[in-house]
Design a protein with these regions (language model features):
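N-terminal Rossmann-like dinucleotide-binding module
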Residues: 1-49
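Rossmann-fold dehydrogenase core element
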Residues: 6, 106-125, 143-151
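Histidine-centered divalent metal-coordination motifs
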Residues: 19, 78, 183
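Acidic-histidine catalytic/liganding microenvironments
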Residues: 26-28, 63-64, 128
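Short, Asp-centered acidic motifs that coordinate Mg2+ and/or phosphate
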Residues: 33, 68, 148
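Aromatic/hydrophobic pocket-lining residues that form π-stacking "cages" and hydrophobic walls in ligand
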Residues: 42, 81, 108, 133-134
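Beta-loop-alpha module in the N-terminal Rossmann-like domain of NAD(P)-dependent dehydrogenases
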Residues: 49-111
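Predominantly a Rossmann-like dinucleotide-binding segment in NAD(P)-dependent oxidoreductases
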Residues: 125-193
């Protein structure tokens, strides 16, 4: 690379549209290109950021100026994209959860390890200001020794939320437990140690 920035490619422009935008606002990061099957979303991102859009994610993997692939697809598809990106020598940031099956998660970890690339899972709740303050208080011992943690989730979404891939076993895995409660589970692990 001719500069010191890290080149990003984003697969999936549902929630990934926001992550693509963040890549353009992050020091040291450079959004290079995006991939999505939906032409409207692809063209919108391309025009907004002045980058290439592809309807075939493999075009991202072929680019030498992309260092990191952000996988922002339905949860049950994370494995395939991650493994292909690793084989292409790209580091991977996958949105949560890592995948809907432990076997696929293990396959992703193995593929990245064998390729010598980094695999990270995006748990954005860790970066919310209130959560950061609680973590600092825990780490500094201001709350005493943490011995028990509890999380609760009230969850309601209208029927239209579940008309696509959400709520399917293949792509959503376990409904609100895995797709939404994963944040609470991660917070317990992060805060409790």
């Amino acid at each position: 690379m001719s500069d010191d920035t890290v080149g990003f490619g984003v697969i999936g422009l549902g929630m990934g549209a926001g992550r693509a935008r963040l890549a353009t606002q992050t020091a040291g990061a450079r959004l290079v290109a995006v991939a999505d099957l939906d032409e409207e979303r692809g063209r919108k991102a391309s025009e907004e950021h002045g980058i290439n859009w592809y309807d075939d994610y493999r075009r991202l993997l072929d680019r030498e100026d992309i260092d990191v692939i952000m996988v922002m697809t339905p949860s049950g598809a994370h494995g395939d994209f991650t493994i292909e990106a690793a084989k292409a020598g790209k580091h991977v940031i996958s949105t949560k959860p890592i995948d809907v099956s432990l076997e696929r998660a293990d396959d992703m970890i193995t593929a990245c390890r064998e390729a010598g690339v980094i695999l990270a899972v995006d748990f954005e709740a860790r970066y919310m200001a209130d959560n950061v303050r609680v973590k600092q208080a825990v780490d500094e011992g201001r709350l005493g020794k943490m011995v028990l943690g509890e999380a609760r989730l009230k969850w309601y979404r209208g029927h239209d939320y579940y008309e696509g891939w959400h709520g399917t076993w293949k792509y959503d895995g376990g409904g609100s437990l895995i797709n939404q409660s994963i944040h609470q589970i991660d917070m317990l692990v992060w805060l409790m140690g």
